[in-house]
């Protein structure tokens, strides 16, 4: 059965508070599966399985699938629809509260697939990256504007701290755009399927990741300010900051949105050296 048929079969009522929009376009489903590149060696962690339409396709291809679902009304539906699969584990929990490192422990070749409610997209991606969870890739359907921020380059309005965070740890690839007409109920925004391939090492080597991300965050807090004014929040004396900018070869009159990840790394290391 397809998604609409399963929804009708169980007379499922969508929960607006959970931001539920179920994918009904099979071509998008196929592109997610193709993009995720799932094999029998892979353990898949799926966030937001809905009524299990994508989950079935994952179960047919993966070694095992762990699906995380918050909505208690979906649990019996998933249990019934997927009862024939012995490689399926259903976790009834909020993905924001999951111990991902614990879940991934002693598992090889972990790939994540997610159709996230838009309000939890950034918190979950940030957690997976900052907590250094051991996964190979994350194939995710998210709001178009967020995907464009993740995949952005310097000198554009989409480029920001989320861009730097994700691209510090991952390569990014936009797989396809998804129209609101591909969902029930129909959302008010366009979506994009994007894949994040985890790098074996961060894109740049820095002396302090904590300082690096503090510099990045401060540089984008007030986008129209120069780096000199933005980085005053670090509470470093004027002479030391002048020295750091000079050693990094970066004009303090530039704005954060003009710096590459490599330049942020160079600047944060020069600040680290003078602290």
Swiss-Prot record:
InterPro entries membership: KsgA/Erm (IPR001737), rRNA_Ade_diMease-like_C (IPR023165), rRNA_Ade_Mease_Trfase_CS (IPR020596), rRNA_Ade_methylase_Trfase_N (IPR020598), rRNA_adenine_dimethylase (IPR011530), SAM-dependent_MTases_sf (IPR029063)
Protein's recorded name: Ribosomal RNA small subunit methyltransferase A
Stated role: Specifically dimethylates two adjacent adenosines (A1518 and A1519) in the loop of a conserved hairpin near the 3'-end of 16S rRNA in the 30S particle. May play a critical role in biogenesis of 30S subunits.
Keywords attached to this entry: Cytoplasm, Methyltransferase, RNA-binding, rRNA processing, S-adenosyl-L-methionine, Transferase
Binding-site residues, S-adenosyl-L-methionine: 21, 23, 48, 69, 94, 115
Database matches in PANTHER family: DIMETHYLADENOSINE TRANSFERASE, DIMETHYLADENOSINE TRANSFERASE-RELATED
UniProt keyword Transport present: no
E.C. designation(s): 2.1.1.182
Pfam families to which the protein is assigned, alphabetical: RrnaAD (PF00398)
Compartments where located: Cytoplasm
Family under the similarity heading: Belongs to the class I-like SAM-binding methyltransferase superfamily. rRNA adenine N(6)-methyltransferase family. RsmA subfamily.
Catalytic activity: adenosine(1518)/adenosine(1519) in 16S rRNA + 4 S-adenosyl-L-methionine = N(6)-dimethyladenosine(1518)/N(6)-dimethyladenosine(1519) in 16S rRNA + 4 S-adenosyl-L-homocysteine + 4 H(+)
A single GO molecular function term of this UniProt record: 16S rRNA (adenine(1518)-N(6)/adenine(1519)-N(6))-dimethyltransferase activity
GO cellular component labels: cytosol
Enzyme class: transferase
Annotated SUPFAM superfamilies: S-adenosyl-L-methionine-dependent methyltransferases
Organism expressing this protein natively: Clostridium botulinum (strain Loch Maree / Type A3)
Gene3D superfamilies per UniProt: Ribosomal RNA adenine dimethylase-like, domain 2, Vaccinia Virus protein VP39
């Amino acid at each position: 059965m397809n998604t609409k048929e399963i929804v009708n079969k169980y007379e499922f009522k969508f929960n607006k508070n959970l931001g539920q929009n179920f994918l009904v376009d099979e071509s998008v489903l196929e592109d997610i599966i193709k993009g995720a590149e799932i094999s029998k060696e892979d353990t898949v962690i799926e966030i937001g399985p809905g009524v299990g339409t994508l989950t079935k396709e994952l179960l047919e291809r993966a070694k095992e699938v762990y699906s995380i679902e918050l909505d208690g009304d979906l649990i019996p539906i998933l249990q019934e629809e997927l009862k024939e699969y012995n490689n399926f584990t259903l976790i009834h929990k909020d993905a924001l509260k999951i111990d991902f490192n614990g879940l991934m422990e002693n598992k090889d070749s972990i790939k994540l697939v997610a159709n996230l409610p838009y309000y939890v997209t950034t918190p979950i991606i940030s957690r997976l990256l900052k907590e250094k969870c051991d996964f190979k890739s994350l194939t995710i359907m998210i709001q178009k504007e967020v995907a464009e921020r993740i995949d952005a380059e310097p000198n554009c309005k989409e480029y920001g701290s989320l861009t730097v965070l994700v691209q510090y740890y991952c390569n990014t690839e936009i797989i396809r755009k998804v129209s609101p007409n591909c969902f029930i109920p129909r959302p008010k925004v366009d979506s994009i399927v994007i894949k994040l391939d985890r790098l074996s090492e961060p894109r740049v080597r820095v002396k302090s990741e904590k300082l690096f991300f503090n510099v990045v965050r401060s540089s984008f807090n007030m986008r129209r300010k120069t780096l000199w004014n933005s980085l005053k929040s670090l509470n470093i004396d004027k002479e030391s900051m002048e020295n750091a900018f000079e050693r990094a070869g970066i004009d303090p009159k530039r704005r954060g949105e003009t710096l590459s990840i490599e330049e942020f790394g160079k600047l944060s290391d020069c600040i680290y050296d003078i602290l």
